[in-house]
Amino acid sequence: MELENLKEVKENFQIMKPSLKDPNIVIFNITDELSNEEFIDSLRAQNEDLTNATLKIRTSYKSKFGKNWIISMDHVAFNALKKRKNINLNWQMLSFKENFRIIQCFKCANYGHTAMTCRDEEFKTGGGICLRCADKGHRERECHADPKCSNCTSHNLKFGSTFKTDHSARSNDCKIREKEIDFIISRTNYGP
């Protein structure tokens, strides 16, 4: 009976290894107003490692001292860049670091989806939980309570683990966030 089921599964399903994503970096504090094309052209012209690289702009966002840009690139360019401390752009030396593109829901605080696609029945309508203290009824920016991570608390209850919970759900000290980063790294193409 089991062999028949296995045969049926083989005929109806295909097993595929997920494709790996290109590594991303975030370049900090770009003060010049650049079009996407000017940005890429300047990176290529002033960074020998990027001359022939496959570069793709993911997004940019305002920061305290300009704009931060997130770009993806092929593993060869990424591995060459990570040996450096700075990247050149418009005759400035700017700092950068790897960016993991962590997706976290601002309703339930879980990873892998956004608030818009949250399936948690508890948060379908109305607001979610505070990412700082895990309580309902207010947002993180309004919170003055002691931090308590909803993800580590849930993991401890579900699996009997003893993760510390005295941090926000967005903290770099969060063990669940570390696991999410490890998962992203496992799906990234860093080359052979």
Role assignments for model-derived ranges:
Residues 1-192:
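Solvent-exposed, positively charged interaction surfaces of folded domains
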